[in-house]
Amino acid sequence: MAMWRAAAGHLLGRALGSRAAHTSAGSKKIVGVFYKGGEYADKNPNFVGCVEGALGIREWLESKGHHYIVTDDKEGLNSELEKHIEDMHVLITTPFHPAYVSAERIKKAKNLELLLTAGIGSDHIDLPAAAAAGLTVAEVTGSNTVSVAEDELMRILILLRNFLPGYQQVVHGEWNVAGIAYRAYDLEGKTVGTVGAGRIGRLLLQRLKPFNCNLLYHDRLKIDPELEKEIGAKYEEDLDAMLPKCDVIVINTPLTEKTRGMFNKERIAKMKKGVIIVNNARGAIMDTQAVADACSSGQVAGYGGDVWFPQPAPKDHPWRYMPNHAMTPHISGTTIDAQLRYAAGVKDMLDRYFKGEDFPVQNYIVKEGQLASQYQ
């Protein structure tokens, strides 16, 4: 297909001996890395995205004779993950508690054939290294797009309406209407621009339409003309020309080498003073200190999102302490509904893997050593 092109290291990977795209016969060692549920693990039977829930596939895998190991311990040479790298066949991880799969780890993983992301976004994997090794990398495309788009809309409203200071007043026994109202705004009539209009970006634009906003979008490709007309969104080919027009900017582009650090001090300075930024894409798309400085200076009136770099965010991460933020841990795409969708998607791909069948084409990030074009 046109979307697949050989990665630069693909021929090298083939020369070194690529890994099988489909499973060979016999029992497989499958390792899952998820966040720990702890005291919350047994509070909801559908809470399958945690270590204890294990995506709800343990009984199914073990009934087929496979070995399934699940952990949240993923960092360092003495981690639980590291103990299993050399002989695991499949690694399942998640953007919400990512196991960073470096070229070094791929080199150690002699039996590794398949890397699955339970959710969307596989930038925790060194994709060129995976391609060079002939691996397959796939994710559950579409599994949490609604979840993330809804969360983005929520954060836009939280920041525009200056909700968080009001909430804090109530918690601390205070009452000062002026301290909230002096910078609270309606969403109606504002110009909202999304950087990226893929599945999540389009869903956000559709949800913004009833608010009577002026909607702009920037992407490599224009969305379908009929949908564009239905939503009432205008395409902006030049990102830097779009930014000064926007009262609200939402980041919906994947993290690639082209987008890493995309929003630096200079680009943020091109935005309208007092802009609201929402980023549920990836933290590394932003220059961390530039965002914190812009929030402190007032160039950015509010910054919200659930993505950080690195993750989990260290205690001294500047975004924890910058003014006017609406930051949370990485939660937008791991609602219970999303967990059930991406758990089902992982099970489906594992079943296809065991049977030697292809995955849904949209799920592939690297297919048998070939990197999807958008990650080139």
Curated annotation (Swiss-Prot):
Primary location: mitochondrion
Name of this protein: Formate dehydrogenase 1, mitochondrial
N-terminal signal peptide: none
Keywords: Mitochondrion, NAD, Oxidoreductase, Transit peptide
Catalytic activity reported: formate + NAD(+) = CO2 + NADH
Self-association state and partner proteins as the record states: Homodimer.
GO CC list: chloroplast; mitochondrion
Family assignment from sequence similarity: Belongs to the D-isomer specific 2-hydroxyacid dehydrogenase family. FDH subfamily.
Transit peptide, start-end: 1-20
Role: Catalyzes the NAD(+)-dependent oxidation of formate to carbon dioxide. Involved in the cell stress response.
Membrane as UniProt keyword: no
UniProt binding sites for substrate: 120, 144
GO biological process: formate catabolic process
